[in-house]
From Swiss-Prot:
ATP binds at G154, M155, A156, G157, C158, G159, K160, S161, R265. This is Apoptotic protease-activating factor 1. WD repeats lie at residues 613-652, 655-694, 697-738, 741-780, 796-836, 838-877, 880-910, 922-958, 959-998, 1001-1040, 1042-1080, 1083-1122, 1125-1164, 1175-1212, 1213-1248. It comes from Homo sapiens. SUPFAM superfamilies: DEATH domain, P-loop containing nucleoside triphosphate hydrolases, WD40 repeat-like.
């Protein structure tokens, strides 16, 4: 019975005994089921009415709450209202079916049982841990009334005792499993006399009426026997709770064949006892939300109102209940010390985090130290060795085998003792064991052993060197990943600077590590240990860091590129190049193929860092306000956050159910907003990646998001294809304001620097300015009007205003639409200036530099431009991306900017470096002549000038400034010819610069041009479906007419014959002297994309957009073989020199090698593809066999060499750009020339 009810009954006992008549009262109680017939008989046997009443009340006092209520109701029913009123205040809350009352969830029965059993009350500040409590209750219920053990184990301060008490605070558990009650014993660390005292006290408590013995047991054995008898006879089906058991010999004393729940740091204590055993491990962390809940209760604040330091405290201590409670109790007394206690945690000053509390220890270091001190002397030093481990790092057993020079079994036995005592944790993944320390244990060890740390790190390096060489670590070794990640850390911590430099400046180490973990961690280490590496050689350190930064997008891909070949592309002064050259020469002797880029000194790489965080297009990327981090989002539906300096990944979040279109950091960098095609806007914690809010009030995809520039009152603006802008207050669950006015999709929005205005851009052709406070429209500028022709205004013209950017002073706004940028005055709405970027691309994005008058502009034609907005002149071209550039953004200080692209990469550029560069870019229309040791390249540059480049010396002659569309060199380098966009053809004599111009002009752009071997005749083809044969010395011209559509290309044959192929699906053979068409082959239903002629001149091949290739004889009008199997357009083909093989390449990056005689497929050469990446980097556009037929070279997104015998790749050369159109190969197959889509010329030579 509840104490209150019992007291009330005792207080009014005299009045009740005087007045009540028991017979009618007992009838009611019998009918309620709370009094038995035998009890009624016992009452009736009393001689007087008062004695009968006294006997009834004595019986009720021994019963439960329900009996009290039944007695109260009987009094009311029989007219004793005054007496019932006396008992009214003592009426207990009767338990419901669940056994819980409405106030605390605990019945009076539970309270009474726990109070009598000495179970501790809940702490002053208490949060539930339902999952763990349920797990303990499930294990207890498994005992089913039989003797057994349930062990709760975990490290110091993880809340084991609180959980044990909470588990038995349950009505149904006590009533169903332990009706005999519970008995709590706080055991702790005991000697024999202390243990005897504990047992004596327990026996006394269990035998209060001294019915078994009137004296205390004199020794432990007697006490054990006494306990067994008491539990069996007086307290059957009761639960004995032993709190904080340290030793197995102590536990033996309580082994009395009863049901026992115990808490311990050492789960092996039950090894010495018999009976069923169940274990409940307790994690050392409460979890972030529970931790914050405890702090909020201590300081009496809402969880949402807690300062940022609260989150950091939970993060630092990993949610340790002991630490959170200690700090919470301290903060209750000193509520302004958040920063102070956080610093003490960060600086590992555990002694200063001290507070008397319900815990057994007043300070964190006490709780941990006692566990360590209790270790056996022979293993204490091994625990000290763990001081060198880093937080959150799981260490394979093999690492510690090397450290201690022991067999695996010996090491596992030692570590298991640490695990059993909750001093170490073990992650068992199949057969392999990995061990780790709690963060607080790491901090405790490093503080305790700080004077030994350098020697401990030196010890592990010395042991590593005995067992391993860094570059010989194999991925199948259990410990290899640990060494790749932490070898440099141990060397730096051991102050082994010489060894660290040797490691970090080794191309072998770079290769081995990047192949397994990618480049970001290595870049991080170069930054982390820069002060050490620079002491050795600053330039070398920069060489390696730049190499990793600029090749990061390649080094993170599969198949892993040949790092020696990448190293050969570095400047010749670079240490990376020198090591690569040395290694390549050794490997060439063993038959390996390597290429030297002999004209690379003319190339300047403008990117500072290239990262590839996504597996699909990157739609947006932005800097954090402190410039230290970059967030990016894209078509792979993820949000990525990485370090701006190294590209090291910090967060990867599966953010939305569809493509993520935009992301933005808040001004205080605490949050990141994302918006998506799935119509949702989400707010994330930028440090942890936790979802903070989800807003879904837009009815169409959300295109943009932007935070206010001040964190004083943080607002988020979003724009959607539903034509609306919305403002969101992060403290509210719903939209704060909706802005109506646009009549088409809102593409972009930006707050002004002072946050008073919000600018928005729309597909309706307008820029609108809104009052950020009232959400009213202030101004609207019709950008569309600037594109309308005054003479013929096309009102239905679509002008999409893509984006806008404010100047730093907020006086001007830059707006992008189509291929133009407009600058408007904010106050007058007047047009200040206009920038025209060119006809061939549209502007995707633009951004104002925060410091000066620079604007960065992203274009659809893969490039980025920098413009001076005052002079309206282009300052720089930045080429490097391989596809559309979707986003650009300056860093907060303007020193760098980032670009994000469809090619899955984000590039960082240094503003000053880019502005100083004025590199000339080439068009891909080039011709090459290999003459003895010379390589002469005729090329058209980006401003349509003609250049003659000596590939060996790099000398450039600028020949003409005509609008050249194609060009060629004569075989003996005496003449050059070029055609233009208007159809005109000219020949330039190189000796005297004399020009010969054809009187016979093509009607459309000239695309192909070639001299005959005697240099007297020039052949050209154009979009006009004609081929022109011009004997320029006699000024005579023959037109080859017969194709119905554009001539794709042509090839000269022997005996004045010419082979041509066309979009009309035919291949034709012409006599170029007479102009007669000699043969007409109807080859394909689709466009004929390429042809090649066998070296014996008896056959030719044709490939087509219909996904087939065919082999033809010049003597037959039907094909010899039709080659099927390609799944894309077959774009190129090539015969081997002996005419026995034919190679074909398609738009899926697949190459097939066929037997010419029977048409059988011999090899399928398809490079392995990453998810989202085309094989061969795109279309295969050109192929060429080596003279001996053993090797094949292919051009596509990059250049590959193949072993024809095996069909396997021999080497890959990654060009800076992509989409190579043609590869020019020297007759000896040792020199190769091509131009990528960035306009970079590559003259490659086989390394010998």
């Amino acid at each position: 019975m509840d104490a209150k009810a019992r007291n009330c009954l005792l207080q009014h006992r005299e009045a009740l005994e005087k007045d009540i008549k028991t017979s009618y009262i007992m009838d009611h109680m019998i009918s309620d089921g709370f009094l038995t017939i035998s009890e009624e008989e016992k009452v009736r046997n009393e001689p007087t009415q008062q004695q009968r009443a006294a006997m009834l009340i004595k019986m009720i006092l021994k019963k439960d709450n329900d009996s009290y209520v039944s007695f109260y109701n009987a009094l009311l029913h029989e007219g004793y209202k005054d007496l019932a009123a006396l008992l009214h205040d003592g009426i207990p809350v009767v338990s419901s079916s669940s056994g819980k009352d409405s106030v605390s969830g605990i019945t009076s029965y539970v309270r009474t049982v726990l109070c009598e059993g000495g179970v501790p009350q809940r702490p002053v500040v208490f949060v539930t841990r339902k999952k763990l409590v349920n797990a303990i209750q499930q294990k207890l219920s498994k005992l089913k009334g039989e003797p057994g053990w349930v062990t709760i184990h975990g490290m110091a301060g993880c809340g084991k005792s609180v959980l044990a008490a909470e588990a038995v605070r349950d009505h149904s558990l006590l009533e169903g499993c332990f009706p005999g009650g519970v008995h709590w014993v706080s055991v702790g660390k005991q000697d024999k006399s202390g243990l005897l005292m504990k047992l004596q006290n327990l026996c006394t408590r269990l035998d209060q009426d001294e019915s078994f013995s009137q004296r205390l047991p004199l020794n432990i054995e007697e006490a054990k026997d006494r306990l067994r008898i008491l539990m069996l006879r007086k307290h059957p089906r009761s639960l004995l709770i032993l709190d904080d058991v340290w030793d197995s010999w102590v536990l033996k004393a309580f082994d009395s064949q009863c049901q026992i729940l115990l808490t311990t740091r050492d789960k092996s204590v039950t090894d010495s006892v018999m009976g069923p055993k169940y274990v409940v491990p307790v994690e050392s962390s409460l979890g972030k939300e529970k931790g914050l809940e405890i702090l909020s209760l201590f300081v009496n604040m809402k969880k949402a109102d807690l300062p940022e330091q609260a989150h950091s405290i939970i993060k630092e201590c990993k949610g340790s209940p002991l630490v959170v409670s200690l700090i919470g109790a301290l903060l209750r007394d000193f509520p302004n010390r958040w920063e102070y206690y956080l610093k003490q945690l960060q600086n590992k000053q555990f002694k200063r985090i001290r507070k008397s509390s319900s815990y057994d220890y007043e300070a964190l270091d006490e709780a941990m130290s006692i566990s360590v001190e209790m270790l056996r002397e022979d293993i204490k030093d091994y625990y000290t060795d763990l001081s060198i481990l880093q937080k959150d790092v799981k260490v394979p057993t093999k690492v510690l085998c090397i450290l201690w020079d022991m067999e695996t079994e010996e090491v596992e036995d030692i570590l298991q003792e640490f695990v059993n005592k909750s001093l170490l944790f073990c992650d068992r993944n199949g057969k392999s064991f990995r061990y780790y320390l709690h963060d607080l244990q790491v901090d405790f060890l490093t503080e305790k052993n700080c004077s030994q740390l350098q020697d401990l790190h030196k010890k592990i390096i010395t042991q590593f060197q005995r067992y391993h060489q860094p570059h010989t670590l194999s991925p199948d070794q259990e410990d290899c990943m640990y060494w790749y990640n932490f070898l440099a850390y141990h060397m730096a911590s051991a102050k082994m600077h010489k060894e660290l430099c040797a490691l970090m400046f080794s191309l072998d180490w770079i290769k081995a590590k990047t192949e397994l973990v990618g480049p970001a961690h290595l870049i991080h280490e170069f930054v982390e240990y820069r002060h050490i590496l620079d002491e050795k050689d600053c330039a070398v350190s920069e060489n390696f860091q730049e190499f990793l930064s600029l090749n990061g997008h390649l080094l993170g891909r599969q198949p892993f590129p040949n790092i020696v070949q990448l190293g050969l592309c570095e400047p010749e002064t670079s240490e990376v190049y020198q090591q690569a050259k040395l290694q390549a020469k050794q490997e060439v002797d063993n038959g390996m193929l390597y290429l030297e880029w002999i004209n690379k000194k003319n190339i300047t790489n403008l990117s500072r860092l290239v990262v590839r965080p996504h597996t699909d297009a990157v739609y947006h990327a932005c800097f954090s306000e402190d410039g230290q981090r970059i967030a990016s989002c894209g078509a792979d539906k993820t949000l990525q956050v990485f370090k701006a300096e190294t590209g090291e990944k910090l967060l990867e979040i599966k953010a939305h159910e569809d493509e993520v279109l935009c992301c933005a950091f808040s001004t205080d960098d605490r949050f990141i907003a994302t918006c998506s095609v799935d119509k949702k806007v989400k707010i994330w914690n930028s440090m942890t990646g936790e979802l903070v809010h989800t807003y879904d009030e837009h009815s169409e995809q959300v295109n943009c998001c932007h935070f206010t520039n001040s964190s004083h009152h943080l607002l988020l603006a979003t724009g959607s294809s539903d034509c609306f802008l919305k403002l969101w207050d992060l403290n509210q669950k719903e939209c704060r304001n909706t802005m109506f006015g646009h009549t088409n999709s809102v593409n972009h929005c930006r707050f002004s620097p002072d946050d008073k205005l919000l600018a928005s851009c729309s597909a309706d052709g307008t820029l609108k300015l809104w009052d950020a406070t009232s959400a009213n429209e202030r101004k609207s500028i019709n950008v569309k009007q600037f594109f309308l022709n005054l003479e013929d205004p096309q009102e239905d013209m679509e002008v999409i205003v893509k984006c806008c950017s404010w100047s730093a002073d907020g006086a001007r706004i830059m707006v992008a639409a189509k291929n133009k940028i407009f600058l408007f005055d904010i106050h007058t709405s007047g047009l200040l200036g206009e920038i025209h970027t060119g006809h061939h691309s549209t502007i995707q994005y633009c951004d104002f530099s925060p410091q000066n008058h620079l604007a960065v502009v992203a274009l659809s034609q893969y490039c980025v431009e920098l413009w001076n907005t005052d002079s309206r002149s282009k300052v720089a071209d930045c080429r490097g991306h391989l596809s559309w550039v979707h986003g650009v953004m300056f860093s907060p200080d303007g020193s760098s900017f980032l670009t994000s692209s469809d090619d899955q990469t984000i590039r960082l550029w240094e503003t000053k470096k880019v502005c100083k560069n004025s590199a000339v870019m080439l068009k891909q229309e080039v011709d090459v002549v290999f003459q003895e040791n010379e390589v002469m390249v005729l090329a058209v540059d980006h401003i349509r000038r003609l250049q003659l480049i000596n590939g060996r010396t790099g000398q450039i002659d600028y020949l003409t400034e005509a609008q050249v569309s194609c060009c060629c060199l004569s075989p003996h380098l005496q003449y050059i010819a070029f055609g233009d966009e208007n159809g005109a053809i000219e020949i330039l004599e190189l000796v005297n610069n004399r020009i010969f111009q054809s009187r016979f002009q093509h009607k459309k752009t000239v695309w192909h041009i070639q001299f005959t071997a005697d240099e007297k005749t020039l052949i050209s083809s154009s979009d006009d479906a004609e081929i022109q044969v011009w004997n320029w010395q006699l000024d005579k011209c023959i037109f080859l007419r017969g194709h119905q559509e554009t001539v794709k290309d042509f090839r000269l044959l022997k005996n004045s014959r010419l082979l041509s192929w066309s979009f009309d699906g035919t291949v034709k053979v012409w006599n170029i002297i007479t102009g007669n068409k000699e043969k007409d082959f109807v080859c394909h239903q689709g466009t004929v994309l390429s042809c090649d002629i066998s070296h014996d001149a008896t056959k030719f091949s044709s490939t087509s957009a219909d996904k087939t290739a065919k082999i033809w004889s010049f003597d037959l009008l039907l094909p010899l073989h039709e080659l099927r199997g390609h799944n894309g357009c077959v774009r190129c083909s090539a015969f081997s020199v002996d005419s026995t093989l034919l190679a074909t390449g398609d738009d899926n990056g697949e190459i097939r090698i066929w037997n010419v005689s029977n048409g059988e497929l011999l090899h399928l050469c398809a490079p392995l593809s990453e998810e989202g990446a085309a094989t061969h980097g795109g279309w295969v556009t050109d192929l060429c066999f080596s003279p001996d037929g053993k090797m094949l070279i292919s051009a596509g997104g990059y250049i590959k060499w193949w072993n024809v015998v095996t069909g396997e790749s021999s080497q890959t050369f990654y060009t800076n750009g992509t989409n190579l159109k043609k590869i020019h190969v020297s007759p000896d197959f040792k020199t190769y020339v091509t131009v990528d889509n960035l306009g970079i010329l590559y003259i490659l030579q086989t390394l010998e």
